[in-house]
Regions:
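Short solvent-exposed loop/turn micro-motifs enriched in small/polar/acidic residues
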Residues: 22, 77, 113-115
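Short, solvent-exposed amphipathic alpha-helical segments in soluble enzyme
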Residues: 54, 75, 136-139
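Short, hydrophobic/π-rich interface segment
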Residues: 83-119, 123, 136-138
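An N-terminal amphipathic alpha-helical segment
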Residues: 57-95
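Short Gly/Ser/Thr- and Asp/Glu-enriched loop/turn motifs at secondary-structure junctions
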Residues: 124-129
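N-terminal, charged amphipathic alpha-helical interaction modules
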Residues: 1-72
Length: 139
């Protein structure tokens, strides 16, 4: 879509001007300098709870969905300060922290070991972009 079409959808086009700072929600990696992205609103928490939320996400042009192995944390998470939020089965927040991305894997492991935790969301702690959803691997 052209810029007017994007604006009608509350979205804007951006060109990455640094190697970090443009995390693609689809490919789960940072855009390279010069890559085109869309910055769009995304209902990352569509649950019928007080925590229902929409926030900004970047999507790289031509991005392919990432496929991660069980217990893997996207590499772009390790490179930033992250806000982590754990939710229960009623989609209510029960735990939250801000931490360096290299600590996220251990935090998720401890949270998801608790049967009362249903899933977690990761956000960029500085700019608030939604990074990804974390849940238990299907068996």
């Amino acid at each position: 879509p052209d810029d007017a079409g994007l604006a009608a959808r509350y979205a804007v086009r951006r060109i990455a001007d640094s190697a970090r700072g443009f995390p693609c929600r689809v490919s789960l990696r940072d855009a390279a300098v010069g890559e085109e992205l869309l910055l769009v609103p995304y209902w990352h928490q569509p649950a019928a709870s007080p925590y229902r939320a929409c926030g900004p996400v970047f999507i790289r042009r031509g991005a392919m969905p990432a496929r991660l192995a069980a217990n893997a944390v996207p590499p772009y998470v390790a490179q930033r300060l992250v806000s982590v939020r754990a939710y229960d089965h009623a989609d209510c927040l029960v735990a939250a922290e801000v931490m360096e991305g290299v600590q996220v894997g251990a935090w998720l492991g401890s949270q998801l070991d608790d049967p009362g935790i249903a899933y977690a969301h990761l956000h960029s702690a500085r700019h608030g972009c939604y990074l990804c959803h974390a849940g238990r691997a299907l068996r």
